[in-house]
Curated annotation (Swiss-Prot):
Superkingdom of the organism of origin: Eukaryota
Family: Belongs to the phospholipase A2 family. Group II subfamily. D49 sub-subfamily.
Signal sequence range: 1-16
Name listed for the protein in its UniProt record: Phospholipase A2 crotoxin basic subunit CBc
Expression sites (tissue/organ): Expressed by the venom gland.
Catalytic activity: a 1,2-diacyl-sn-glycero-3-phosphocholine + H2O = a 1-acyl-sn-glycero-3-phosphocholine + a fatty acid + H(+)
Cellular location(s): Secreted
Subunit structure: Heterodimer of one of the acidic (CA1, CA2, CA3 or CA4) and one of the basic (CBa1, CBa2, CBb, CBc or CBd) subunits; non-covalently linked. The acidic subunit is non-toxic, without enzymatic activity and comprises 3 peptides that are cross-linked by 5 disulfide bridges. The basic subunit is toxic, has phospholipase A2 activity and is composed of a single chain.
E.C. designation(s): 3.1.1.4
Annotated site residue numbers, Putative interfacial binding surface (IBS): 18-19, 23, 26, 33, 38-39, 76, 119
GO BP terms: arachidonate secretion; lipid catabolic process; negative regulation of T cell proliferation; phospholipid metabolic process; venom-mediated edema in another organism; venom-mediated muscle damage in another organism; venom-mediated myocyte killing in another organism; venom-mediated platelet aggregation
Length: 138
């Protein structure tokens, strides 16, 4: 399933939400979402199960939980207004869904920055088969 996330990002002809999230991640971490986060741990990328492997993976788990609360929104494709300046991500005015999706992404990108010091390259292309057991509750 995670491969679908990469394909989706590569096939989007206009700036869609996933590309916006990638820009936020790069702004905060100075790393591209692909390859540094698309397959990281058990939750970064599309889907997830088991326990988060570390602080970076937990950021992705919390991001998934945030999206889970937005079931009526098109979390993968809605384009939202935002700006990157003076060291901050600022979500702009939009529809309720756009504002909520932007906040989920902003919080996740900032979380990934805070967890940079514990980023483990061994989790960078972590196989789904090693993500076992029940998922934590959001």
């Amino acid at each position: 399933m995670r491969a679908l996330w990469i394909v989706a990002v590569l096939l989007v002809g206009v700036e869609g939400h996933l590309l916006q999230f990638n820009k936020m991640i790069k702004f905060e971490t100075r790393k591209n979402a692909i390859p540094f986060y698309a397959f990281y741990g058990c939750y970064c990328g599309w889907g997830g199960r088991g326990r988060p492997k570390d602080a970076t993976d937990r950021c992705c788990f919390v991001h998934d939980c945030c999206y889970g609360k937005l079931a009526k929104c098109n979390t993968k494709w809605d384009i939202y207004p935002y700006s990157l300046k003076s060291g901050y991500i600022t979500c702009g005015k939009g529809t309720w869904c756009e504002e909520q999706i932007c906040e989920c992404d902003r919080v996740a990108a900032e979380c990934l920055r805070r967890s940079l010091s514990t980023y483990k390259y061994g989790y960078m292309f972590y196989p789904d088969s090693r993500c076992r057991g029940p998922s934590e509750t959001c």
